[in-house]
């Protein structure tokens, strides 16, 4: 189940043969088209802001302001990249649904007889959807949920002065990002300019790492070599305040400059000073 078809396609191409050799079949791919966002952007933005306000226990205007500022700030200087089409294998049924929380999504999973579901870059499932699916649901979270739950990815680690994020595959439960942990792996934060560029670069590289982590967890579950880890959930975070956004921007640029300076110094050391002939 995914809202990022390219990620699902990458996962299948990379791991289909190995999973089959381990006795694991991919029953279907359910793609969330998020039709509400496409048909009414204003209602979509308000809906996201309401969820953020509820989680952060803040006012709707405040949540809406943080949402707009974060989107504009994180996308500043972003270059539009061509989106390549993704060919999902014809042998694997694929379904396009208005939302992963729709009846169509649940019916598609049940019709294919799936024993478990994986959320690849998907949105939050509602309590009723979790109950109706009625089986193990695995989700990928770009942080250690003992440190922080919620969003945005990478941001809170940057603000904490970290050099890595801890990618996590955990069970989906009603409480956000609080289900038992099935696998984790460190991913380096790629400081490369401001906070927006840093998040994008880190998450782009994390897609491959998370894909491999999902596959390893599925293989381990099938072989019964993976033991779920219960934990005390960390705090839930939402979109940051403007002051936090400014602080993260400064931290990213300082670290990016330090990395560039270090690389240049290393290059000069390796090459050595030019010698007169």
What residue ranges belong to the model's regions?
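One-carbon transfer enzymes
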Residues: 1-277
